[in-house]
UniProtKB/Swiss-Prot annotation:
GO terms for biological process: alcohol biosynthetic process; gibberellin biosynthetic process; mycotoxin biosynthetic process. Its EC number is 2.5.1.-, 2.5.1.1, 2.5.1.29, 2.5.1.10. This is Geranylgeranyl pyrophosphate synthase 2. Geranylgeranyl pyrophosphate synthase; part of the gene cluster that mediates the biosynthesis of gibberellins (GAs), diterpenoids that may provide a selective advantage during infection of the preferred host plant, rice. Gibberellins (GAs) are diterpenoids and are synthesized via the mevalonate pathway. Biosynthesis of the major metabolite GA3 (gibberellic acid) from geranylgeranyl diphosphate (GGPP) requires 13 steps. The gene is GGS2. Mg(2+) 1 binds at D148, D152. It comes from Gibberella fujikuroi (strain CBS 195.34 / IMI 58289 / NRRL A-6831) (Bakanae and foot rot disease fungus).
């Protein structure tokens, strides 16, 4: 490989008019075998260069050949000034971080930070570790938003241009992936090696849940309500559970395994409530229209729980026909979306979803009450957060 590099370099110069020679040091990155015995080898069979060994090579240069400085820039010298190296690292860090820093400037409700603080009432994790957990969950959440917006072709995020429409899809996805890797690196600082496999398994579950959601959309497959809930438990619930998992691994509280299991169930239930509520609000809330666009989920082809119920109860197949036009047109018109909402209302799907959310909210509150009894500690912070998410009727 190194000999081929040298050969390629030689072709850049006019050897026929060479009048001087330049000696450079080639630093080898991989072991390769000489065709001839190296000077310091006693073997007649040929030797080898070990990793990072050096070999001095004479290169003929013409009168008009590039200067030695140019040659050194062609990766034949690993020497680099500390100033140049610092500038390069600073620039690459700025470029890699820019899309992520952009999404951090967008308005946020701070739900996940408040959620972690509320769980910590019971788990008593030290402040330093709690800060890392908040940062990690924020990194995973925001990087997933960057990816989601690109996958869904969403032009807006929280009322501002989506990250991929500002930096381009390639740069946005590269940064999102980069941030996920950085998050996992930070997780390694606060959990032991034995627990790391379980933690990364939870992160993997998030992507698997998202994969199912995307697959249904791409192939126009209408999932059952049970399948939808399983997907939500993976896609959204897993990130909520990851918060609990990281807190539990760093907890200084005396909390029983049964209490942790009950807390995990409550957290999964809250994750389901959160996703169903978010999808429902996308259909009926004017604030969501300002932030994301009018019924944007319908443009994306996403199967929300409300839409699944409406399709199951639509004997006229009107919804099926309208949704098929999205695949033809690329998106639905405002009038088509209004017709979808009309069918949902007529079929009782909007009311059904609203009632279901009310029941889920009641169950979450009941789980909190049960945990307060078992832990002998009230959790006003978690109660306040759940009340904040309560659907206004």
């Amino acid at each position: 490989m190194a000999e081929q590099q040298i050969s390629n370099l030689l072709s850049m110069f006019d050897a026929s008019h060479a009048s001087q020679k330049l000696e450079i040091t080639v630093q080898m990155m991989d072991t390769y075998h000489y065709r001839e015995t190296p000077p310091d080898s006693s073997s007649s069979e040929g030797g080898s260069l070990s990793r990072y060994d050096e070999r001095r090579v004479s290169l003929p240069l013409s009168h008009n050949a590039a200067s030695p400085d140019i040659v050194s820039q062609l990766c034949f010298s690993t020497a680099m000034s500390s100033e140049l190296n610092h500038r390069w690292k600073s620039q690459r860090l700025k470029v890699a971080d820019s899309p992520y820093n952009y999404i951090l400037t967008l308005p946020s409700k701070g739900i996940r930070g408040a959620f972690i603080d509320s769980l910590n009432v019971w788990l008593e994790v030290p402040e330093d570790e709690t800060s890392v957990i908040k940062e990690v969950i924020g990194m995973l959440h925001n990087s997933s938003l960057i990816i989601d917006d690109f996958q869904d072709n969403s032009p807006l995020r929280r009322g501002k241009p989506s990250t991929h429409t500002v930096f381009g899809p390639a740069q946005a996805i590269n940064t999102a992936t980069y941030v996920i890797v950085k998050a996992i690196e930070k997780i390694q600082d606060i959990v032991g090696h034995d627990a790391l496999a379980d933690v990364t398994g939870t992160i993997t579950t998030i992507f698997q849940g998202q994969a199912m959601d995307l697959w249904w959309t791409a192939n126009a497959i209408v999932p059952s309500i049970q399948e939808y809930l399983l997907m939500v438990n993976d896609k959204t619930g897993a990130l909520f559970r990851l918060s609990l998992e990281l807190l539990a691994l760093n907890s200084e509280a005396s909390i029983s395994d049964s209490a942790l299991e009950s807390l995990s169930s409550a957290v999964s239930l809250l994750g389901q409530y959160f996703q169903i509520r978010d999808d429902y609000m996308n259909l009926i809330d004017n604030k969501y229209t300002d932030q994301k666009g009018f019924c944007e989920d319908l443009d994306e082809g996403k199967y929300s729980l409300t839409l699944i119920h409406a399709l199951q109860t639509d004997s006229s197949d009107l919804l099926t026909n309208i949704l098929s036009m999205r695949r033809v047109q690329g998106k639905l018109t405002a009038q088509q979306k209004m017709l979808v909402l009309e069918v949902m209302k007529t079929n009782g799907s909007l009311d059904w979803t609203s009632k279901l959310l009310g029941m889920l909210h009641t169950r979450v509150v009941a789980e909190i009450e049960s945990l307060e009894v078992s832990t002998k500690r009230d959790n006003h912070a978690l109660r306040a957060l759940v009340e904040r998410l309560k659907l206004e009727t």
